[in-house]
């Protein structure tokens, strides 16, 4: 066993003495059992994580029952909704790397035989995923689950995105204070990840098709007894994985990454999944995985399930309609869309996991014969503004908008743009350009949910576009193009766009261009000032020095002269 490194032999007597002091070694025979880490992410200020201490206790009990010795530790967590619109958002994406590094540190320092990961919200799941392939110790994931959708006084289904959009409507005078406060009070009625197909739930759904979580992981409610049952089931599967020495890199292959994007396309997931899954591919040592490959997948996978913010349906509606398994079953039956014979943490293949799945509500999950669209809900755009690519959630764009051509109005920060939208400087026909908000420029690639929500809340969702080298919340909808690469801080051409330039967003042709000759752009480049880091000390300064643009997944890259 891997853990023999810290518990076997005369030399490890001091380590054994310390292990006895933990209270987890309850009998002499426990030293002969697998040591299992429970990588939890309990934190009081994140509603998706407030119940995870209880879930960890369920996992501990089941691990002991299955023959292992559990040891729990916690990572950090950032709530993107609470951190939105201020300096806190600059820490959100960077927290992914902190989580991965922290988990790697504890797992490798203590030589665990297996790891039970309990994530839930936006950066916690991908951070733990990066750690799982980096340490490559037998592992399983079981998230905390989504919250219930809220209900307004008027009987309207609510999610957190409803509140963000209400801010714009209230400021504009089109919503009463009574309705505004009602939304605020009722949109988030329980613990769990936010109720729509936002980043957290998108990632937790992808865990099922990646093969790292059991069916039901992405949609089973946080407050349900079934969520506790999933934790128990996962603990027993983990002990089998340890026994058989099946590791994350045996499961997370190039085919698995392809299939994750296929499901993403079918369910119209958050654009953040692109960032995190690209980072996962890099961490797993999968070479030559780029945005063009994602577009190829989008062209062959239909869009089957439109969930909030793209509709009024919540994650619980998806669960009742058959869950992720029902969507995956459609992709299996489609033929050629995914690789269904890959192994998963259940010991079965994807095909076997979903064999009995069926659609219970064809309004929530469309059958493959009647998709929302014959192509996927996400699209990668390329052009002279984004030579390395950009991402848009086409499932969140009004279907009547196929090509948008408008006049650029440029801002060098999120806050400047929000102010301009609020004071009506931004008008119908504008393309709002927000740059220097990428991974390096932000720093931290903050989400642009406030400006997009304000645009939609004012009724301009079809009439104003927004493009940025920053990113978007999974709650974003409208004509919102993010992840533009290279970013402005890295010299990307988004920095060369001027007010009044005509920008064309062509969704069918997957292009993003500014109508300015190349030679003019090159002249503008000569006048471009050198980027200087906005943060000079602390973690964000170190992050700025190492982070790369979004087309890589926003990974940290060690200077080549240090590793060659």
Swiss-Prot record:
GO BP field: isoleucine biosynthetic process; L-valine biosynthetic process
Subunit structure, interactors included: Homodimer.
Required co-factors: [2Fe-2S] cluster; Mg(2+)
Presence of the UniProt keyword Iron-sulfur in the record: yes
Signal peptide: none
Record field: catalytic activity: (2R)-2,3-dihydroxy-3-methylbutanoate = 3-methyl-2-oxobutanoate + H2O; (2R,3R)-2,3-dihydroxy-3-methylpentanoate = (S)-3-methyl-2-oxopentanoate + H2O
Source taxon at top rank: Bacteria
Function of the protein: Functions in the biosynthesis of branched-chain amino acids. Catalyzes the dehydration of (2R,3R)-2,3-dihydroxy-3-methylpentanoate (2,3-dihydroxy-3-methylvalerate) into 2-oxo-3-methylpentanoate (2-oxo-3-methylvalerate) and of (2R)-2,3-dihydroxy-3-methylbutanoate (2,3-dihydroxyisovalerate) into 2-oxo-3-methylbutanoate (2-oxoisovalerate), the penultimate precursor to L-isoleucine and L-valine, respectively.
Binding-site list for Mg(2+): 80, 122-123, 447
One Pfam family, short name: ILVD_EDD_N
HAMAP family (alphabetical): IlvD
Keywords, alphabetical: 2Fe-2S, Amino-acid biosynthesis, Branched-chain amino acid biosynthesis, Iron, Iron-sulfur, Lyase, Magnesium, Metal-binding
Residues annotated with N6-carboxylysine modification: 123
PROSITE patterns hit by this protein: ILVD_EDD_1, ILVD_EDD_2
Pathway in which this enzyme or protein is active: Amino-acid biosynthesis; L-isoleucine biosynthesis; L-isoleucine from 2-oxobutanoate: step 3/4; Amino-acid biosynthesis; L-valine biosynthesis; L-valine from pyruvate: step 3/4
InterPro entries (UniProt xref): Dihydro-acid_dehy_C, DihydroxyA_deHydtase, DiOHA_6PGluconate_deHydtase_CS, ILV_EDD_C, ILV_EDD_N, IlvD/EDD_N
Entry similarity comment: Belongs to the IlvD/Edd family.
Cofactor note (record): Binds 1 [2Fe-2S] cluster per subunit. This cluster acts as a Lewis acid cofactor.
Active site per the UniProt annotation: 473 (proton acceptor)
Residues at which [2Fe-2S] cluster binds: 121, 194
Enzyme Commission numbers on file: 4.2.1.9
Gene Ontology terms: cellular component: cytosol
Name the UniProt record assigns to this protein: Dihydroxy-acid dehydratase
Molecular function as annotated in GO: 2 iron, 2 sulfur cluster binding; dihydroxy-acid dehydratase activity; hydro-lyase activity; magnesium ion binding
PANTHER family registered for this protein in UniProt: D-XYLONATE DEHYDRATASE, D-XYLONATE DEHYDRATASE YAGF-RELATED
């Amino acid at each position: 066993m891997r853990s023999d490194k810290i518990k076997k032999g005369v030399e490890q007597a001091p380590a054994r003495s310390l292990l006895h002091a933990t209270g987890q070694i309850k009998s002499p025979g426990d030293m002969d059992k697998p040591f299992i880490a429970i990588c939890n992410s309990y934190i009081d200020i994140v509603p998706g994580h407030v119940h995870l201490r209880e879930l960890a206790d369920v996992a501990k009990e089941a691990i002991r029952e299955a023959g292992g010795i559990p040891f729990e530790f916690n990572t950090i967590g950032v709530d993107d909704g609470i951190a939105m619109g201020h300096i806190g958002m600059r820490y959100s994406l960077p927290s992914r790397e902190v989580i991965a590094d922290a988990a790697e540190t504890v797992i490798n320092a203590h030589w665990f035989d297996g790891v039970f990961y309990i994530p839930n919200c936006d950066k916690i799941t991908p951070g733990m995923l990066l750690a799982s392939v980096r340490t490559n110790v037998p592992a399983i994931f079981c998230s905390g689950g989504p919250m219930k959708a809220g209900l307004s006084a008027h009987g309207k289904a609510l999610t957190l995105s409803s509140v963000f959009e209400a801010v714009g409507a209230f400021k504009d005078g089109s919503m009463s204070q009574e309705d505004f406060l009602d939304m605020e009070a009722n949109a988030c009625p329980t613990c769990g990840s936010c109720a729509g197909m936002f980043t957290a739930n998108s990632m937790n759904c992808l865990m099922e098709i990646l093969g790292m979580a059991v069916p039901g992981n992405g949609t089973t409610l946080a407050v349900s007894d079934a969520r506790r049952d999933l934790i128990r089931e996962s603990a027993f599967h983990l002990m089998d994985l340890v026994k058989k020495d099946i590791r994350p890199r045996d499961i997370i292959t190039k085919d698995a990454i392809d299939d994750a994007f296929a499901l993403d396309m079918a369910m119209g997931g958050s654009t953040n999944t692109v960032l995190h899954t690209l980072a996962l591919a890099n961490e797993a040592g999968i070479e030559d995985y780029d945005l063009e490959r994602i577009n190829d997948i989008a062209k062959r996978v239909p869009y089957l399930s439109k969930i909030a913010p793209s509709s009024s349906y919540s994650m619980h509606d998806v669960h009742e309609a058959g869950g992720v398994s029902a969507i995956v079953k459609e992709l299996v039956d489609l033929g050629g869309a995914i690789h269904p014979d890959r192994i998963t943490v259940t010991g079965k293949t994807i095909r076997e996991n979903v064999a009995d799945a069926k659609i219970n509500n064809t309004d929530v999950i469309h059958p493959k014969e009647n998709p929302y669209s014959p192509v996927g809900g996400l699209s990668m755009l390329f052009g002279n503004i984004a030579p390395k690519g950009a991402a848009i959630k086409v499932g969140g764009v009004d279907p009547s908008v196929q090509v948008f051509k408008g006049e650029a109005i440029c801002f060098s920060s999120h806050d400047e743009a929000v102010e301009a939208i609020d004071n009506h400087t931004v008008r119908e026909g504008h393309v709002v350009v927000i740059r220097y908000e990428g991974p390096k420029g932000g720093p931290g690639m903050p989400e642009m949910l406030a400006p997009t929500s304000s645009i939609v809340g004012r009724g301009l969702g079809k009439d104003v576009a927004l493009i940025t080298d920053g990113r978007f919340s999974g709650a974003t909808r409208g004509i919102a193009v993010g992840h533009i690469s290279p970013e402005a801080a890295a010299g990307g051409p988004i920095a060369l766009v001027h007010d009044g330039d005509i920008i064309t967003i062509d969704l069918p042709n997957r292009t993003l261009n500014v109508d300015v000759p190349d030679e003019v752009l090159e002249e503008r480049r000569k006048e471009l000032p050198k980027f200087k880091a906005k943060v000079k000390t602390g973690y964000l300064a170190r992050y700025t020095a190492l982070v790369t643009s979004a087309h890589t997944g926003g990974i940290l890259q060690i200077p080549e002269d240090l590793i060659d």
